[in-house]
Amino acid sequence: VPVIKFTDQKSFSQISTEAKELAKRAKDKKLQPAEMDGNTFTVSNLGMFGIESFTSIINMPASCILSVGAIKQVPVVKNGAVVPGNTMMLSLACDHRTVDGATGAAFLQTLKTFIENPVTMLV
């Protein structure tokens, strides 16, 4: 799995650009070993294959892995009316030697807020 290092010091744009470059090199089988070393958090997305929900296994040395499922349109209630809405299943597996379950839950709550209201990421 390609690793984007020092993401806390990069903008969303820089992370996006680097992710695209690493994905292209991975597809072309041109990744270097150093580009796959040192991960702490992994994102596994099977949603693009129509998989709605799954549980990933943490690859060491990562502390967590986030499983991202497909976006599915379902009826939701908004302002008292039933309307079409998009839902997506996320699952977070944490190594409890390094990440407490409550910390993982807080992360998922924050991520949910960001996904439902993307502008909050910029504030």
Label every PLM stretch briefly.
Residues 1-123:
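C-terminal catalytic/motor cores of large multi-domain enzyme assemblies
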